[in-house]
Amino acid sequence: YDDLNKEKSSDKYEYIFPSFNISKDLESNLDGTLTFNNIGFNKLYDTNVNEKILVNNLSYESIDSINSIGLVNNYEIILKNFNSDSNNSNNYKNKKESDLQGLLQFNSKLPLRKIGKNFDSLLTPIFVAKFNPSSNRNIKNSDRIVDYNNIFSSNRLSSDETLEGGES
């Protein structure tokens, strides 16, 4: 499209090729859900800035298991393959790049219920342990918010490019 705010006539045009996001639940003999996800795009803007991104995700989420005291446990495993090929980009390295990351997350919760005369109360303490042997990308300039909606999510950074590094 034509950006009329650009001064140089050669920078006025931006080419955004179709992006894609394909997800497929894979059949498996595992007790849980195995999902493959593929994301990609190609952008050409400011005359000579080219960004090509391809991300492959393979994730597994086990079914919940409830033990004798009522703890509900499950785990998640994510393998992420990030590939980029960029020229003159401020967002990515100006070369071909490939990065493989993995994340293991254990979730446990104990649903509690207090029955009273006038009302019932519910409380569910949640315990989450994560481990990623890789370090994550520097995304401090990204607009990411961790709040109560995604605090226990395996991808709480909401990033297609990286997983949260280290352990927590």
Model-derived segments and spans:
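Outer-membrane beta-barrel proteins and related beta-barrel translocases across Gram-negative bacteria
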Residues: 1-168
